[in-house]
Design a protein with these regions (language model features):
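C-terminal regions of mature proteins
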Residues: 367-408
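Glycine-rich phosphate/diphosphate-binding loops that line cofactor/substrate pockets in enzymes
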Residues: 9-22, 100-108
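Histidine-anchored nucleotide/phosphate-binding helix
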Residues: 34-46
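Conserved functional hotspot residues or short segments at active or partner-binding sites
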Residues: 259-380
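C-terminal and late-domain segments of enzyme folds
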Residues: 5-9, 16, 26, 35-37, ...
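Short hydrophobic segments within beta-strands
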Residues: 25-27, 53
Length: 408
């Protein structure tokens, strides 16, 4: 059973929400200023909240990327007597999926998380694992998804993940930038699993808060500090698979990138008769952004306390920008022009032993391009075809009027 609700969660008349034993998968983005409190506080006051499941980054988005949440006693000071906290991002790989017995004693499960529109973002993976558990174990529990708008909008970028690159940072079949809300993604997971449990999506338009405030104002994780970050993240996240800093440890992660060895590029334009990095003849040129060369010093993560030569990307108002394509071209440029450039070695993420760049790119054709085995025109056309395939597939799961689109 599936339903799409147009009134807010707390206005729902369902008796299971008022009297049933509730579980809640959430973090700090489930905060509602009309009540001045988090959803877990509101439900705890009702007396029927039994369990809170936590995704990567913790209850308040306080943990950096890939930091395991094992010490749950840090939440004891909240004073939520009788409410159990469960980590879905612990050291044990099995923690990524909730244990069956932690679900079967509940009557309903509520989910409220703010996604950012990219397949690497693990909140969707946590939700996907939950749906797979419900389907596999035939658990007939009511699930309520409090939807939020996608801050990255309806633009689609990239190719659908190939099965061999599946991991916790990539669900097979999802493109790099999917254009869906978390409610619409839930509908897709539900349909593809042929699930039967009752699924109810609470419209993002049911509350002015979920529609207008939350997607833009509360950072969903430590390195997505603002709205603009979401427009860059789809492409700039690929730097995680290299020895280039993606800007973690600065106030502008994913909006800037660099490395100490990139200092060798400082005279590139002069040597090649180019006016600047924004010269249309420059290999890094993209009409969607202005490129500002700079230096920055990360306070943690890659190149901690070291001066990095690099670039800040500034959106060009009114122009379309394909972050993934720009990142791929930039990465190929660095590979060809900086001998020190390397892909990050070793295992990167649970569920797959492949290197980080393979899991993040997730496509054999795009990896061939990065390795110099095919040219950009072929790659660009391939990306276009893949984006068109995804739009045709995903449009039946749309819950709102605005349609999916791609950069022409």
């Amino acid at each position: 059973m599936f339903s799409f609700r147009t009134t807010s969660l707390l206005e729902q008349p369902d008796l299971v929400l008022k009297n049933g034993r509730l579980g809640l998968l959430c973090n700090h983005t489930a905060w509602h200023p009309e009540y001045g409190e988090y959803l877990f506080e509101t439900l705890a006051k009702r007396g029927n909240l039994k369990r809170v499941f936590l995704p990567e980054h913790g209850l308040f988005g306080e943990l950096q990327d890939q930091i395991k949440l094992d010490k749950l006693n840090v939440y004891d000071s909240l004073g939520l007597n009788g409410v159990e906290f469960v980590s879905l991002y612990g050291t044990d790989e099995n923690s990524l999926t909730a244990q069956k017995e932690l679900i079967t004693d509940l009557d309903a499960l509520i989910v409220e998380l703010q996604d950012v529109g990219a397949r690497y973002y693990t909140y969707n993976s946590t939700l996907y694992n939950l749906f797979r558990l419900l389907k596999k174990e035939d658990i007939n529990i009511s699930v309520y998804i409090v939807d939020h708008l996608n801050p990255a909008g309806r633009q689609v970028e990239g190719t659908m993940l190939e099965g061999e690159y599946t991991s916790f940072i990539g669900i097979e079949g999802l493109p790099h930038r999917h254009g869906l809300t978390i409610g619409e993604m839930s509908s897709l997971f539900y349909s593809e699993a042929n699930a039967k449990f009752p699924l109810h999506i609470i419209s993002a338009n049911a509350s002015l808060i979920t529609k207008d405030l939350l997607p833009w104002s509360i950072p969903p994780s430590p390195n997505i500090p603002g709205l603009f970050t979401c427009f860059f993240y789809c492409g700039q996240c690929l730097w995680e698979g290299t020895n280039v800093s993606e800007g973690r440890g600065t106030t502008r992660p994913f909006e800037q990138f660099g490395a100490p060895y990139m200092e060798s590029l400082i005279n590139y334009n002069k040597r090649n008769g180019l006016m600047s990095w924004n010269d249309p003849e420059n290999p890094l040129y993209d009409q969607g952004v202005y490129i500002r060369w700079q230096r920055f010093i990360p306070t943690f993560h890659k190149y901690k306390d070291q001066s990095c030569f690099g670039f800040q990307l500034l959106l060009n108002p009114g122009m379309q920008y394909h972050s993934l394509s720009h990142a791929l071209r930039t990465m190929r440029f660095l590979k060809d022009n900086c001998p020190e450039f390397e892909f990050r070695p070793g295992k990167y993420e649970v569920g797959n032993d492949k290197k980080a760049i393979e899991l993040l790119v997730g496509d054999s054709v795009l990896l061939m391009y990065l390795n110099g085995e095919c040219d950009w025109d072929v790659t660009k056309e391939y990306i276009k075809i893949e984006e068109q395939k995804w739009i045709r597939k995903a449009k039946k799961y749309l819950l709102y009027d605005e349609q999916l689109c791609r950069v022409k």
